[in-house]
């Protein structure tokens, strides 16, 4: 009886073995493509397993994002909105605006794409400025606030024509999402998309293991040359974004001014968080919350994380003695590579 059962099972076992060998062989035969280029004022790196190279299509998609959301592109939709031109927004703009609005509400305004006039005035945006007066800041607070703009029938409506939008704190993450969607549409199962440090991963790396993504040590590095890592995370089928005040800053009269502006006060944030890394289901969300956590500080961040168990955070902060310390979501421990 057992012999008959074994004979009956043999064909199925053979199919299983052959299928497994075929899959493994295919994984080793199909090469990984390595694309890099320049977009949104930064460098991108994209690695994906495919016989075909899709860099041309990838760049076409990224140019669509730039044409919709870049305030540095004078012909973009967001630039026209900032000039108060009556223009219908596209699907990309709509998707980002609605997500930004949602996260603004969830963070009580810590994330706010209307902060553009303040960012510009401090010299970190798409217009020049540096260390404004208290009077200037007070006047800008009257035109900043996510509740001062709305999307009505595919048009942006402003309460004040001087209100301006800047999606820089979410656009790179969104760009990574757009590329990831394209690759999935092509049937690609193993890839890593990175645009200016904002990452989306799927499947495995060339080494047949989860993608390992580094978190930089937050050392003052305005030239973006520091490659020393604080830690490495195993990130698979997730998105990761990092925000920090150690690259975009300047000193005036011996005081450091960093690029993260608190929309409520109008001033650069002055607390002990040096770097905020967030893992989420999509990169636009990770990007926006990473910026929010830089504004909120440690206590505010922990409150948001209690409301959003789907988010993981890795925070590097300075203690009372000026030494770097780390706090991270308890469930993140399982993905710490080192």
Task: Give the label of every model feature segment.
Residues 2-338:
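Mature catalytic core of soluble alpha/beta enzymes
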